[in-house]
């Protein structure tokens, strides 16, 4: 069937996973059916039973990914661990790792790249792009259609604490707070610049249809009290 297994218990339970490659101790050890998988690394893809056309590379990458993890990619130590990876791409250490032990998996079509990017994404959050360390690290779809979905976060800590907002674009890096760093909710906002439209971390605020461009633009102050249809351009605008 063209399956290659190298390592202690690698692919040991395979019954019909044609064209798969399992390399490393415990790699793909629980895969039974579903072909064309690649699992390389200690326990990569382990406890994943019916994945198909998926790629898991790294220590515990794709470990315990669910049965519908078809055509997903998880590369990096613990990338995509405990996650429903279907059609998503997680690259980097702990990217897309759903670490709370629940069965509240993320939706599909997410792209995460960077150290702990999308760390903890869950409950149906789908179609997001997060690039940069800790970007998009709290996305929680609450199993509601289009919640915590279709966001773009680019930069270190961009959108770090956004939980349920959708259709947002945040571009900007900062070690203590990237664009939309402390904003928990809100839809169709654009923030460009370090610390732009940070929010103050409080619950109940739901800004919509704002554009903030510039370092610190929008901030967490007065604009957050009138959160819709604002435009701010310039440093601390």
Where are these regions (language model features)?
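Glycine- and small/polar-enriched repetitive beta-structure motifs of secreted/surface proteins
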Residues: 1-237
């Amino acid at each position: 069937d063209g399956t290659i297994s190298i390592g202690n218990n690698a692919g040991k339970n395979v019954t019909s996973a044609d064209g798969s490659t399992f390399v490393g101790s415990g790699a793909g050890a629980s895969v039974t059916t579903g072909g064309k998988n690649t699992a390389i690394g200690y326990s990569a893809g382990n406890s994943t039973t019916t994945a198909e056309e998926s790629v898991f590379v790294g220590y515990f990458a794709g470990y315990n990914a669910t049965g519908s993890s078809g055509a997903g990619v998880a590369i990096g130590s613990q990338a995509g661990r405990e996650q429903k990876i279907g059609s998503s791409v997680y690259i980097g250490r702990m990217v897309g790792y759903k670490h709370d032990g629940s069965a509240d998996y993320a939706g599909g079509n997410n792209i995460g790249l960077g150290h702990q990017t999308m760390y903890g994404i869950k409950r149906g959050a789908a179609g997001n792009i997060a690039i940069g360390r800790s970007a998009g690290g709290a996305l929680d779809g609450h199993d509601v259609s289009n919640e915590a979905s279709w966001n773009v976060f680019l930069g270190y800590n961009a959108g770090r604490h956004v939980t349920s907002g959708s259709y947002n674009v945040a571009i900007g890096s900062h070690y203590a707070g990237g664009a939309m760093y402390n904003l928990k909710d809100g839809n169709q906002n654009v923030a460009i610049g370090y610390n732009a439209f940070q929010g103050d971390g409080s619950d109940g605020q739901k800004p919509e249809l704002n554009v903030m461009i510039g370092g610190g633009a929008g901030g967490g102050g007065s604009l957050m009290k009138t959160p819709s249809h604002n435009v701010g351009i310039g440093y601390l605008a």
